Amino acid sequence: MHNTLIERLFWHTAQRDDAKVADHLYCRKEMDTVYTLDEATLFDFFFHYLREIEVFPLLEELDPETQERENIPFLQFVLVYLMRVIGSIPKMEPVWELLLTDELLMGLCGFNAYQVKNGSCDRGTKLRKAPMPEVRGALCVDTLANQIVKITPRRLENFFNHSIERLAQARVFPKYIHAACDTTLYETTDQYEGCGSVFRERKVKARGYRKAGELKAVKVWLYGWKVWAIYEVQTGIPIAIKIDTIEKPDNLHVLAVLEQAKQNVKQTRVIRSLVVDRGFLDGKSLYAIDQQGIEFVIPLKSNMEATRDARALALSYEDGTCIEKTREVTVTHGYGKNTWDEKVLTTLVGIPGLMSCDWFNPEGSEANTAKKDYEPIPLNAVVVKTWNNQTPPVDKQVVFVTNGELKDPFVVFDRYDDRSLIENNLFRETKQDWHLQDPPKKTREGVFVQVYMVMAMKALTKAFLMWQEEQQRLHALGKETSWEMYRRRLKMLNRNKLIVFVEDNFGIFLSHEVIMLTDVPVHKTAKELGVTRSSIYTKYTGLSPP
């Protein structure tokens, strides 16, 4: 978890143990490092950033207002779960050990030291058969899970959308957005309440008398949900999310999720282009995207008439209507002394005004294209003749279509190539590193909480890292940053406190306590406060000095 937090929030945490550090100072009179307490923890800086861009109040709005007795403000449940998501804790059970018993982290969530040690209430303690742990933790893991799934899907969706709005207002995104849209399956078992199901073909490892590594196609039932996302390719931030059951077709929600993305960034930014995969090949939807002034790029299916026409036209491009371009790139392979360079060629043929896309119209494939007055709408096509030195046969050539300009076919080609970023940097990363498919409970509500919180934290932590880079740039130019102003405020609140690090532990003390524990007399302060070196040792360790 620590390495994950360092990567995502660019800070460092250690185990707080005031007694151990006090004993070390008393006996050895040395320490590794010491900072004033304005060197806040990783989450404290992150929470400050959320307040600065006005996202923190949105966390308070997640309260479903269903608690009859509000012993604990709902925001505290949200903050703990947020830490679970960012800390990449795969299951709910380890949350107790990694978060709920950590006094420093729970302090940031609003719990005090007594609650961390003794729990926030006595409910269930009399019925407990096992011995009570020395540190109960601020919450029970089951309580956290039961409370967090009470957030309604509508509140979660609003939280995500408003968070993206705040990022757009903070000018995190480029002025003209080039986006990608794709879906991913959120597979579960049939035991999840509210899940959908679909009968799909899957390739599995073959058994029996078959070649090594040979795969066999079998049909299986899949259960779960499907997640739609609009992804801003430059920053790597998802700007709109939609969830439905797993059997729904890809093109069902493309217009809805695109409209939401436009709404989320409309105050300061504009979506200029959208790349989609073959699963979104629906003429009616693509026509609607075109009417919104958004350029799209999509590959055609191999058996379509438009695909065959484009390939045939690419063979006879000498007539002057087509545009052929070749790009050479040097790719380095190997490491050290074994490195070698390879010249990689890619050849494209741009075909303007392809007239055989008769499915591209307001009615889609349902339109009567045989009518005498039917006029097909032209689209521009790009045929890939050679891709990274690989020249496939004509019937295997990839064909893209776009409603955008075709001055340079590589603009279309590169734009579609960016679509792989949503697969690798969003869906694969959130599943593998953010544990997207590990909800707090095996229910529809649990899945919605996990998806929206993971996607929101993915967006906000990415923006936070970008913000830190900007703060460092301003600091290098000699300009005051909001980070520095925040540190000054912390220094005023904690000007007499120090945080002392000894190996993997740290402790927080008043400044005179650190000095006196290391056996350096502070006569005036000791007299005014009536403290001694021994009394300070006992205060933190509960023991008499050795």
What role is predicted for each listed range?
Residues L62-R69, F410-D418, Q432-V449, Q468-A476:
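Short, solvent-exposed helix-loop connector elements
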Residues M1-L50, T525, V531, I536-K539:
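Charged, often Cys/His-bearing segments associated with DNA-binding zinc-finger transcription factors
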Residues V141-W228, Y540-T541, P545:
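Active-site-proximal, Lys/Arg-enriched surface segment
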Residues H2-Q15, D102, Q292-L421:
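An anionic, glycine-rich sequence signature occurring as long contiguous blocks
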Residues K205-Q267:
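Electropositive, glycine- and tryptophan-enriched low-complexity nucleic-acid-binding patches
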Residues T33-L82, E134:
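Basic, short loop/linker segments at the boundary and entry of helix-turn-helix/winged-helix-like folds
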Residues V80, V95-W96, A138-L144, K175-E187, ...:
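Short, conserved catalytic/metal-binding motifs centered on acidic residues
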Residues E318-N361, Q432, Q437-D438, R444, ...:
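A short, flexible helix-boundary coil/loop motif
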